[in-house]
Amino acid sequence: MEDFVRQCFNPMIVELAEKAMKEYGEDPKIETNKFAAICTHLEVCFMYSDFHFIDERGESTIVESSDPNALLKHRFEIIEGRDRTMAWTVVNSICNTTGVEKPKFLPDLYDYKENRFIEIGVTRREVHTYYLEKANKIKSEKTHIHIFSFTGEEMATKADYTLDEESRARIKTRLYTIRQEMASRGLWDSFVNPREAKRQLKKDLKSLEPCAGLPTKVSHRTSPALKTLEPMWMDSNRTAALRASFLKCQKK
């Protein structure tokens, strides 16, 4: 999976994901599914913002090639991918300038046209289920939620999808391509199926010497980027397996 991530995603995205994980003691070489999920989420956030500007009349416009004579402002402020301190600095600046309510959790984007923060979700599960989880966590009608899935489904607050259909289609196509590329390498099942991941984890653990390299403590810290992602079942399975193996070693 790590090799796939480095081949599939832009080096800048990979670097941002690595920094986010390492800052919180997570190793991209071990937490490879999480590594892939963070990179995917970052790319969707960047694609959401790509080519969208506001002209001198305040109207939203799409420009795919830069025109030095055009008086354009980026429609979206990208918050995701920044370190927490800088991200909150950007959020506070936006709130002070626009008067919008400060969110309790770091959002992913700010839309200068609609004057609202946006929370982007990318899920391997049912979009409605994940949308409700996001809404229950945020508990604010001020933050707009937009969920995408790897199957081409999407869901947004009040069915307001913010972007034009073509822009959203680019994101859906990219997610579908990622899924297909994972599947062609035999990675998709372990990325999306908890049982398969658990089976593989047990197999990997059996190949290790008893107690060798097993941690006595498990970190429960969550990286900034993952606060925008769905709960990663891989973490709980790995934690449970390591704990069980460690207890067996203690008894011996």
Swiss-Prot record:
One of the protein's GO biological processes: viral translational frameshifting
Site positions (Important for efficient shutoff activity and nuclear localization): R195, K198, R199
A molecular-function term among this protein's GO annotations: RNA binding
Highest taxon of the lineage: Viruses
The entry's keywords: Decay of host mRNAs by virus, Eukaryotic host gene expression shutoff by virus, Host cytoplasm, Host gene expression shutoff by virus, Host mRNA suppression by virus, Host nucleus, Host-virus interaction
Record remark: domains: The probable endonuclease active site in the N-terminus and the basic amino acid cluster in the C-terminus are important for the shutoff activity. The C-terminus acts as a nuclear localization signal. The C-terminus is recruited to host protein complexes involved in nuclear Pol II RNA processing.
Official protein name in the record: Protein PA-X
The species this protein was found in: Influenza A virus (strain A/Chicken/Hong Kong/715.5/2001 H5N1 genotype E)
Record lineage: Viruses, Riboviria, Orthornavirae, Negarnaviricota, Polyploviricotina
